[in-house]
């Protein structure tokens, strides 16, 4: 006759979580820089060089080197900087402009119908 196993340690019981495979979350990189920030910065410099002067075009090399240094320790750094800009610098909510604060909740608030 078998019995239910005794749980000696409460931490080991239950859900332990799923493993995160770091390779699946890594952004596509070119020259050691994530592709999306590289395209945005490179495209901006190319547009400026067409509108202003072709002498601006060589600025791509040092800017890519600086971007490579930024992502050398953390490949998600530009994503984190973008999220910081989105949530701290750009206030899409009205209370952010007035109270200088923001609160984000995973709950979707819907209009409730009044019961009469």
From Swiss-Prot:
Main localization of the protein?
Answer: membrane
Disulfide linkages recorded for this protein, renumbered to the chain, are: none
The record's subcellular locations are:
Cell membrane
Q: Which GO terms describe its cellular component?
A: plasma membrane
Give the stretches traversing the membrane: 23-43, 45-65
Q: Which UniProt keywords apply?
A: Cell membrane, Membrane, Transmembrane, Transmembrane helix, Virulence
Q: Which domain of life is it from?
A: Bacteria
Q: How does it sit in the membrane?
A: Multi-pass membrane protein
Relate the induction remark in this record: Specifically induced within macrophages by phagosome acidification. Induced at 37 degrees Celsius in minimal medium, suggesting that nutritional stress is a regulating signal.
Q: State whether keyword Membrane applies.
A: yes
A Pfam match is: VirB3
Q: Does the keyword Transmembrane helix apply?
A: yes
Q: What else is known?
A: Transcription of the operon is maximal in early exponential phase.
Family named by the database record: Belongs to the virB3 family.
Task of the protein = The VirB system could be required for the establishment of the replication niche in the host.
The name on file for this protein is: Type IV secretion system protein virB3
């Amino acid at each position: 006759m078998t019995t239910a196993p005794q749980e000696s340690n409460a931490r080991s019981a239950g859900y332990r979580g799923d493993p995160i495979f770091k390779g699946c979350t890594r952004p596509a990189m070119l020259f050691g820089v994530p592709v999306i920030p590289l395209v945005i910065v490179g495209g901006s410099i190319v547009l400026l060089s067409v509108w202003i002067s072709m002498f601006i075009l060589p600025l791509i090399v040092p800017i890519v080197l600086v971007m490579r240094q930024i992502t050398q320790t953390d490949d998600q750094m530009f994503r984190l900087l973008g999220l910081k800009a989105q949530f701290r610098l750009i206030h899409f909510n009205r209370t952010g402009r007035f109270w200088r604060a923001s609160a984000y909740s995973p709950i979707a608030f819907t209009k409730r119908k009044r019961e009469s």
